[in-house]
UniProtKB/Swiss-Prot annotation:
HAMAP family xrefs: Fapy_DNA_glycosyl (MF_00103)
GO molecular function, one term: 8-oxo-7,8-dihydroguanine DNA N-glycosylase activity
SMART domains (UniProt xref): Fapy_DNA_glyco (SM00898), H2TH (SM01232)
Zinc finger (FPG-type): 244-278
Co-factor requirement: Zn(2+)
One GO BP: base-excision repair
Lineage: Bacteria, Bacillati, Cyanobacteriota, Cyanophyceae, Gloeobacterales
Cystine pairings recorded for this chain: none
Self-association and partners: Monomer.
Reaction(s) catalysed (UniProt annotation): Hydrolysis of DNA containing ring-opened 7-methylguanine residues, releasing 2,6-diamino-4-hydroxy-5-(N-methyl)formamidopyrimidine; 2'-deoxyribonucleotide-(2'-deoxyribose 5'-phosphate)-2'-deoxyribonucleotide-DNA = a 3'-end 2'-deoxyribonucleotide-(2,3-dehydro-2,3-deoxyribose 5'-phosphate)-DNA + a 5'-end 5'-phospho-2'-deoxyribonucleoside-DNA + H(+)
Species this protein is from: Gloeobacter violaceus (strain ATCC 29082 / PCC 7421)
Name this protein carries in UniProt: Formamidopyrimidine-DNA glycosylase
Protein role: Involved in base excision repair of DNA damaged by oxidation or by mutagenic agents. Acts as a DNA glycosylase that recognizes and removes damaged bases. Has a preference for oxidized purines, such as 7,8-dihydro-8-oxoguanine (8-oxoG). Has AP (apurinic/apyrimidinic) lyase activity and introduces nicks in the DNA strand. Cleaves the DNA backbone by beta-delta elimination to generate a single-strand break at the site of the removed base with both 3'- and 5'-phosphates.
Amino acid sequence: MPELPEVETLRRDLLIHLPGERVVGVEVLRSDSVGYPADPAIFIEQMQGQIFSDRMLRRGKYLLLYFARGAALGVHLRMSGRLLWRCGEAPLEPHTRVRIPMASGHELRFEDMRVFGRLWLIPVGVPPERVMGGLTRLGPEPFAEMFDGPYLAGRFAGRNQPVKSALLDQQLVAGVGNIYADEALFSSGIHPALPVGGLDAAALERLHRAVVKVLEAGIAQRGATLRNYTDAQGINGNYAGTAWVYGRKGQPCRVCNTPIERIRLAGRSTHFCPTCQRAQQSVQ
């Protein structure tokens, strides 16, 4: 699933291409790719003539692309979605679900192999949270001032949940997924199975700094491509090639040469270095 760095990369790409583009036609090839309005015909009708503004926001893994008249196109890529900026004459990708042609001859295409992603058209004056319910359940942005060691201490107090599982909770912090959770735990030297309630203030401060650091690195590398993710031009991200632990089972740790191990925590594949991330306390 695309995480914060991948969605932020996409936002920055679209900010280059979309402002001033006028929608001249919409084709919905898969009706369940449109979350709102429920009737794709209404979605198509209300998209006609919309002009994209330069107001393009990211909240966690969600995108909000605003139009000049105040409506917005909401996007969540989920597992395998892609937003692609294409010349209108370019062949359709195999899993294209929605086409949004522009007056310039270009198209914004929503491609989604697994069909979990969604587009929403948010009417003028309607809070996005009323249409995109997931926005109401998001915690702070990782780059927000309130996201720090003491914030983590308050949220983790008395809890026995593995720290890896806690980091994936979007109500704790918005935008962190499997890749960058593993990377942050390696960077902070914390074993992924340790109970969050047992982490001291120093460990939580390291973890806070590590989350910010690996997300910034992911953005700088234009995201991580493991299966489906590409940027708006269809180009793969570069982070996976420089990852510390994620996707590197059996390969030597880049710090100590110990083979990277993979376990499952709460049903999620989890990578770590058993030397750099020792289980320093018992895990029940």
